[in-house]
Amino acid sequence: MSDISKLIGAIVGSDDPVIIEFVLNIINKSGNLQEFIRNIQKLDAGISYEDSIKMYNAFLGKQEEEKVRNKVKSSPLSQKINQVLKDDVNLDDPVVTEFVLSILNKSKSITEFQEQLNLMQSGLDNETIFKIYQIASPPVMKEEVSVLPSTKIPAKIEAKIEEEVQKIESLDPSPVLHKVYEGKVRNITTFGCFVQIFGTRMKNCDGLVHISEMSDQRTLDPHDVVRQGQHIFVEVIKIQNNGKISLSMKNIDQHSGEIRKRNTESVEDRGRSNDAHTSRNMKNKIKRRALTSPERWEIRQLIASGAASIDDYPELKDEIPINTSYLTAKRDDGSIVNGNTEKVDSKLEEQQRDETDEIDVELNTDDGPKFLKDQQVKGAKKYEMPKITKVPRGFMNRSAINGSNAIRDHREEKLRKKREIEQQIRKQQSFDDPTKNKKDSRNEIQMLKNQLIVTEWEKNRMNESISYGKRTSLPISAQRQTLPVYAMRSELIQAVRDNQFLVIVGETGSGKTTQITQYLDEEGFSNYGMIGCTQPRRVAAVSVAKRVAEEVGCKVGHDVGYTIRFEDVTGPDTRIKYMTDGMLQREALLDPEMSKYSVIMLDEAHERTVATDVLFALLKKAAIKRPELKVIVTSATLNSAKFSEYFLNCPIINIPGKTFPVEVLYSQTPQMDYIEAALDCVIDIHINEGPGDILVFLTGQEEIDSCCEILYDRVKTLGDSIGELLILPVYSALPSEIQSKIFEPTPKGSRKVVFATNIAETSITIDGIYYVVDPGFAKINIYNARAGIEQLIVSPISQAQANQRKGRAGRTGPGKCYRLYTESAFYNEMLENTVPEIQRQNLSHTILMLKAMGINDLLKFDFMDPPPKNLMLNALTELYHLQSLDDEGKLTNLGKEMSLFPMDPTLSRSLLSSVDNQCSDEIVTIISMLSVQNVFYRPKDRQLEADSKKAKFHHPYGDHLTLLNVYTRWQQANYSEQYCKTNFLHFRHLKRARDVKSQISMIFKKIGLKLISCHSDPDLIRKTFVSGFFMNAAKRDSQVGYKTINGGTEVGIHPSSSLYGKEYEYVMYHSIVLTSREYMSQVTSIEPQWLLEVAPHFYKAGDAESQSRKKAKIIPLHNKFAKDQNSWRLSSIRQSRERALGIKR
């Protein structure tokens, strides 16, 4: 099939030769393009106007090519030239043959013919050129002249030839010294690289860029700077007599090819060091800092003593009286001139003073989104926190805010012991006893160090044998039949067939997640489309898919697959697909009707994540449009009526589980310290109650570890007077082998107590639990709009959560639930249900997705629980400032591109800016590193060594560039696992970052963007990140460390940051972490002018009348060690003197 036939077939959607021939006949019969379009439209075949033009133009192009080819065939001379080209250079192109023939006819001699071909870099050697000229004898050439008008070269080709001729005429005959040329890296060696130089008429013009001339910084390996085949700009610095050319890449802008101005500033210029990491880009060069008053005084003294020169400090010339005795200079002619006779130009001084002034940046409050001017809620605060408690001033909420004294005391006790042990180590190291064996001394020091590392409870836990929970010898088919859901298989299948929407309620461990998808597949539902199942967490999606693949008997990615962010393990044969709810939400962006699926199951719907809530509305809409689509909602809670009501009052099916009565015991009075009360309750149960294990719900890792340590010490103190008590922790950060211990049967005569987070409410089921201790608190994630962060805070749980915790005690037999709060608090201070995530989290990414789907009226969107209006307005304002929304609130072209990336809008904004700034390769790498967990790890027994290794990766400009250093060096080490072990890096996290980078690169390729490297230019990378994170900027404050410009929140640099202990005037942060105070995480220094350049709509330069300067307070110097901070005042000094002399006023 010809190219034109393939094109027509692709447009009409058929490979039928009869249809293609029919279309070709219409083209032949049509006199012109307009007639052809009319004939096509009469057919009503659904072919667009643009496709009609494409077909017609392709047909005409093919005809022109055939004409040229026929002319070549009909001309004996053309055939001979074509044969020579075919034999000598393996080229069989009639257009090239006609082109060579036209040059031959215009040339008066062989010399002129040879020059013309060489000028155009035709690649033909002299022997081939001579052969062609010999073929055309003079009589034949004259004969061909008459034929020439009928064999005209097409106009486009002729214009291109003229353009090439002009380019060739402008080329240098040979390389010119100190001129910059474009080149291509041909070969890389240990001492540099060889570059093919373009822009000269010489063939194969090569030169060497020595390793010392490859970068302004010191280069250890040429591969760090260039790669083979890369196009670069080079300067010719030397041409030897033997023709060898030396090249340089130093001080050359690799984007424009311009020579940068050499940095001639003194290295010792007031501490302004010529840092190896500093960019030479003069456009982004850091301006000189203005001198402070103490510095001015000190410099004036140095100049007066002759130790410094006034010429080094031009800004002080107008302040210092010039003394002719030491400020005399010689003119070029040898005459002496006094320093006070020549004055600096006033305009120049003023310009220099302007340059040294620091830029003061403040918010631009005048420019806001016009479409939100009338939308502000009356009486609502701009940064109002989401309401997550029923009674904010209630006793439970006050207990949550104040925290536990027991935890605080335990923390302080550990710190005191640590200091004592450190003091003993120092004493042992300083005391050199000559009678003592040095080996014994070293062992004593090591024993003391080990006490610093682990507590008694941790040491006991380390000595336990590692196991992986309960094992079973049953075959997989028998295991499936033991699950509670198996007995309801036929009822479930029939319910799915009869209803479009279905709600299934089943306890954790009933088998609903792994079995229902298989039942539907076995019953043939997958014949009409995939069976999809969403999970709220990535780990769950991957692990469940692997388990189901094992049960089905296939490899993951074939019949059963999974999709999580930046990882798609599915294939064309996949029938059952597990995925995170966020990934299905992204699929809805491209396919709103979910046409690939026959059944979609929203698992763990009771968790009410933001993505799940959005999917409720999207799937409800898709199912109404597609009656054959089935939607199943599964939940582990009994409160399922709300789901049923939302999905058009659909049926609810309960999977029965083993449930026994549970006795609820409330506290008689409010507990002052819920941790102390929980520990006392555990001891009381262990001593006074019958057999059965205990489950205690706590809020997080620190509480769990502290409780385990305190309880271990108390049980050890009681000794044999009580039975054996096994203490087990459960939280997500624990290794899986330690977590799995909770599932092992308790040894006879013992009791186990499990301290767990709310993961034990629904996600896991522990057999043997008869007693539940519920303090009534949990950590909840909320969005703090003022700080622009999501933070975990301790808050009272809801009544639904309390009932779910109670139910954990009734799985094995009749149980008891000890609620460490009053019955009044349960009914009066707890909300009925937990506040859904969509009502307490940042919605910027969610709203961007909805806007990309064409949903502009968000107030009318069918949310199950609509988010607060102020939360939506904050998200819309953020998107407007990121330029993804226009003045009418509609998605811009930039916003459409941002929605294609599965990441936060700030990251996608930086990513797209990197394309314009030509540093996309580095930005993709850094974003990949930010998308994974912390790549550094600090083993407790080797913390100093780990910190030392980490410091080697530190970049002086901050953490974003530090992460780039880590990935680049790991890449240079060939992605070695051993390299990670040596440098205390998480190999698994780095491997994940590499996968994420690969996925982002694929998205880049898919949408036609290029990955370009800027060779780690720090200024370019930092400025690119500012384009996305300009709202996360902070300015140094002399009293509190830093204050965010947007919101004025007092923050500090996190101790793990590479900038910790350093002071930059302006910094940018990725997020804020709330621990003992609010810390900026992933911090990078920036220049204030960048904020004004990339976000003039958000920031403006401050002046004398600006609000920030008006509010600024002059705070006097003080001695932070002095008891009386007013001791420096004159009045204080006078009073002290009077007291000493006994004078009374």
Curated annotation (Swiss-Prot):
Similarity-based family: Belongs to the DEAD box helicase family. DEAH subfamily. DDX8/PRP22 sub-subfamily.
InterPro entries given in the database record: DEAD-box_helicase_OB_fold (IPR011709), DEAD/DEAH_box_helicase_dom (IPR011545), DHX8/Prp22_DEXHc (IPR044762), DHX8_GH2-like (IPR049588), DNA/RNA_helicase_DEAH_CS (IPR002464), HA2_WH (IPR048333), Helicase-assoc_dom (IPR007502), Helicase_ATP-bd (IPR014001)
Motif (DEAH box): 603-606
Subcellular localization(s) per the UniProt record: Nucleus
Catalytic activity: ATP + H2O = ADP + phosphate + H(+)
Keyword Electron transport: no
The protein's name in its UniProt record: Pre-mRNA-splicing factor ATP-dependent RNA helicase PRP22
Domain S1 motif: 178-250
Domain Helicase C-terminal as annotated: residue spans: 678-854
Organism: Saccharomyces cerevisiae (strain ATCC 204508 / S288c)
